[in-house]
């Protein structure tokens, strides 16, 4: 009987230790305030990590939580990052641009590089956290020390929001998502200059002069669900975070189809 009691006490102690041990680990750091379009040039502090291939664009499919694909190609060219909550902002931070620089490591160049937010990270390691593509992280290094800097894995950096700049002639592009039909239209927007991100997308079809607000579906994808079928061509009106508006007139043609890409003739300049 005594042996049974001792065994029960031992098991209880082990379970208690497991419970306590399960709560150990790095403390969770609450996110900072959302980053806005206050381009005042002030540098803030953040933690930086990297993911994917050493010289890659991050996500293995060259995409991410914004829904934008082929970020390894120009104009993103692999200079991408996952932003934490106050940077990604539930998708409304998709496409925004930041300068990032590092100084604390001897391998750091101290020169800023510009990255595009195309993905989301959930690691609560700092109020602001950039999980950079391998290429972007290595770009913070002095010439020839890219790999050595990447071996650091995690480091403190400084960052500030900047206006997005694209090559001359680059216009805003719209992608009609797979599975769309006249009652369900989902549109991804990319290559947005200036603020880089969109806070409102509205659609106008051929049957009405009314601008209908679309819902943010996820990432940089906005959708319209309607009982009454929409009829093309469609015009799209975009509102940027700082309140600027542009209209892509009849950007989606009458014979539109899912999984099609349409390049507009407008841009935020």
Curated annotation (Swiss-Prot):
Keywords: Allergen, Cell wall, Cell wall biogenesis/degradation, Disulfide bond, Glycoprotein, Membrane, Secreted, Signal. PROSITE patterns: EXPANSIN_CBD, EXPANSIN_EG45. Residues 183-264 form the Expansin-like CBD domain. It is found in: Secreted, Cell wall; Membrane. Glycans are attached at residue 34. GO terms for biological process: plant-type cell wall loosening; plant-type cell wall organization or biogenesis; sexual reproduction. It is a peripheral membrane protein. CDD domains: DPBB_EXPB_N. One of its GO terms (cellular component) is extracellular region. Expressed in anthers and pollen. Residues 63-169 form the Expansin-like EG45 domain. Residues 1-24 form the signal peptide. The keyword Glycoprotein applies. It holds the Pfam family DPBB_1. Disulfide bonds join 66-94, 97-164, 102-108. InterPro entries: Expan_Lol_pI, Expansin/allergen_DPBB_dom, Expansin_CBD, Expansin_CBD_sf, LolPI, RlpA-like_DPBB, RlpA-like_sf. Belongs to the expansin family. Expansin B subfamily. May aid fertilization by loosening the cell wall of the stigma and style, thereby facilitating penetration of the pollen tube. Acts selectively on grass cell walls, which are relatively poor in pectins and xyloglucans and rich in glucuronoarabinoxylans and (1-3),(1-4)-beta-D-glucans, when compared with cell walls of other angiosperms, including other monocots. This is Expansin-B9. It comes from Zea mays. The gene is EXPB9.
């Amino acid at each position: 009987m005594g042996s049974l009691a001792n065994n029960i006490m031992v098991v209880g102690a082990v379970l208690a230790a497991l419970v306590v041990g399960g709560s150990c680990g790095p403390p969770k750091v609450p996110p900072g305030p959302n980053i806005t379009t206050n381009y005042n040039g002030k540098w803030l502090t953040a933690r930086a990590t990297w993911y994917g291939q050493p010289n890659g664009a991050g996500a293995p499919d060259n995409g991410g939580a914004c829904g934008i694909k082929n970020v390894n190609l120009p104009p993103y060219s692999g200079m991408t990052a996952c932003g934490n909550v106050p940077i990604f902002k539930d998708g409304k931070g998709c496409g925004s641009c930041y300068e990032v620089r590092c100084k604390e490591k001897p391998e750091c160049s101290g020169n800023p590089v510009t990255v595009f937010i195309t993905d989301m990270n959930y690691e609560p390691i700092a109020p602001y956290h950039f999980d950079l593509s391998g290429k972007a992280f290595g770009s913070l290094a002095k010439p020839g020390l890219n790999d050595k800097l990447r071996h650091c894995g995690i480091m403190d950096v400084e960052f500030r929001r900047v206006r997005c700049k694209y090559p001359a002639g680059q216009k805003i592009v719209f992608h009609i998502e797979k599975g769309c039909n006249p009652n369900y239209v989902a549109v991804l927007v990319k290559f947005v200059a200036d603020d880089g991100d969109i806070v409102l997308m509205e659609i106008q079809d051929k049957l009405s002069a009314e601008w209908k607000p679309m819902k943010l579906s996820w990432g940089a994808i906005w959708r319209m669900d309607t009982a009454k079928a929409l009829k093309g061509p469609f015009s799209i009106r975009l509102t940027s975070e700082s309140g600027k508006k542009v209209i892509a007139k009849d950007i989606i043609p009458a014979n539109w189809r899912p999984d099609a890409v349409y390049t507009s003739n407008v841009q935020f300049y």
